[in-house]
């Protein structure tokens, strides 16, 4: 049984392996210009043909769409032939850069096989990205975002910096296919970019909207509310299209690098008071922001996005995620950090028992608290005495010598200079 392909295609179909991202975006842009729009079957046949074309030795870099059209078999299924025809026409309309004049060479050109002479330097060509244009005929109908659509778009721009050509081409394709309102574009910005990039984009968009409202836009009625509110109406297609162009143009003021500065990584500690965290942010922004950059929008954004989870829940519950800083401080002033130290639980003492102790036979205490020593389980293995333990056996104690008699002790106290009687020859004593 054959496969069934639906008419609703993924917002950004995945490119075939081996094809550059900007080339695949050109194929997608040409496919979205078809009337009626492309289906999943058309994208499937396009990827299948590109896989075969990339394996042929006749592949040229940059891609030559006329050569690809000559490689397409006759009667190939799908609308690949129409897609290549649109690319050939668009490539012919884009003026190519003039080639640099050939370098002056001496009369005797060195042979190409000479290993001592390097080949001439060829300047690498920049990736050619076709401009995004809306298809001919009726504009696309508005469709709200779904989570799978946002995930597919974020996966495509994960390696590209905000404002880069690949990033803008992917975003334009998504805007062209879904025709989002101002609320949808705000949700897309918060899902794709960091809080810092979203704050900078919001500042640039506000200035562009103010300039456009002053200049005047076709279909804009100042009495009906701001341009952002009127662009949320799905029936205002022309006015919504103007807002989409302003929203895309606001990315031009973003830096080319997606790396956030050091003050963007300041986070609130688990037990840090909210006002101390905001004070640290304020000092870091004063020392790190370039001159002329507004500080309040960035401070409000970081005060919510970099706060801990408990403060974020308080701000979100009271609707102060992007409110003035004073309201955010008042919302979190009653919050106190939880004490994380362990509290020793003191168990209440049990009343003394009425029964007698198993050891001493007296009442008023438990046997584990008895002061009387525990009796031995049996007689001593040394002396067979059942009243003491082996460690207390008298046989293990050293013997103390007996004291000398009292007479000997008295003799020791006699003076030593008394002369002893001697027997002489004369018989004198």
From Swiss-Prot:
Annotated GO biological process: viral translational frameshifting
Phenotypic consequence of residue 61 to S: Complete loss of homodimerization of matrix protein p19
Chain positions of all zinc fingers (CCHC-type): 355-372, 378-395
Record keyword Nucleotidyltransferase present: no
Superkingdom of source: Viruses
Residues annotated as site: Cleavage: 130-131, 344-345
Misc note: HTLV-1 lineages are divided in four clades, A (Cosmopolitan), B (Central African group), C (Melanesian group) and D (New Central African group).
This protein's name: Gag polyprotein
Source organism of this protein record: Human T-cell leukemia virus 1 (strain Japan ATK-1 subtype A)
């Amino acid at each position: 049984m054959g496969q069934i392909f639906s008419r609703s295609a993924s917002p950004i179909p995945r490119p075939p392996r081996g094809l550059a991202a900007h080339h695949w975006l050109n194929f997608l842009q040409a496919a979205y210009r078809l009337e009626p729009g492309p289906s999943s079957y058309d994208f499937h046949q396009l990827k299948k043909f590109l896989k075969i074309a990339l394996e042929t030795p006749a592949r040229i870099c940059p891609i030559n769409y006329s050569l690809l059209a000559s490689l397409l078999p006759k009667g190939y299924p799908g609308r690949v032939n129409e897609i290549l025809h649109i690319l050939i026409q668009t490539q012919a309309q884009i003026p190519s850069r003039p080639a640099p004049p050939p370098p002056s060479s001496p009369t005797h050109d060195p042979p190409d096989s000479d290993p001592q002479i390097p080949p001439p330097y060829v300047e690498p060509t920049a990736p050619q990205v076709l401009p995004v244009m809306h298809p001919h005929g009726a504009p696309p109908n508005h469709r709200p975002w779904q989570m799978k659509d946002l995930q597919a778009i974020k996966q495509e721009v994960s390696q590209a910096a905000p404002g880069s050509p690949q990033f803008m081409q992917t975003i334009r394709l998504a805007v062209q296919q879904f025709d989002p309102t101002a609320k949808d574009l705000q949700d897309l910005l918060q899902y794709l970019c960091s809080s810092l990039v979203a704050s900078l984009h919001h500042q640039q968009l506000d200035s562009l909207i103010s300039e456009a409202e002053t200049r005047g836009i076709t279909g804009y009625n100042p009495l009906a509310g701001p341009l952002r509110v009127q662009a949320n109406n799905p029936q205002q297609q022309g006015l919504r299209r103007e807002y989409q162009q302003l929203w895309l143009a606001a990315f031009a003021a973003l830096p080319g690098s997606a790396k956030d500065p050091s003050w963007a990584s300041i986070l609130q500690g688990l037990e840090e008071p909210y006002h101390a965290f905001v004070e640290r942010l304020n000092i870091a922004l004063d020392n790190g922001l370039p001159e002329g950059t507004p500080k309040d929008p960035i401070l409000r954004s970081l005060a919510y996005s970099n706060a801990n989870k408990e403060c974020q829940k308080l701000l979100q519950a009271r609707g102060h995620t992007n409110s003035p800083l004073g309201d955010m401080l008042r919302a979190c002033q009653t919050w106190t950090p939880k004490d994380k130290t362990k509290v020793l639980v003191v168990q209440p003492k049990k009343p003394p028992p009425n029964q007698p102790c198993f050891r001493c036979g007296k009442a008023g205490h438990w046997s584990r608290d008895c002061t009387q020593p525990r009796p031995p389980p049996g007689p001593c293995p040394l002396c067979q005495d059942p009243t003491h333990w082996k460690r207390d056996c008298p046989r293990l104690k050293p013997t103390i010598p007996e004291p000398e008699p009292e007479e000997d002790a008295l003799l020791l106290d006699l003076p030593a200079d008394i002369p002893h009687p001697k027997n002489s020859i004369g018989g004198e004593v």
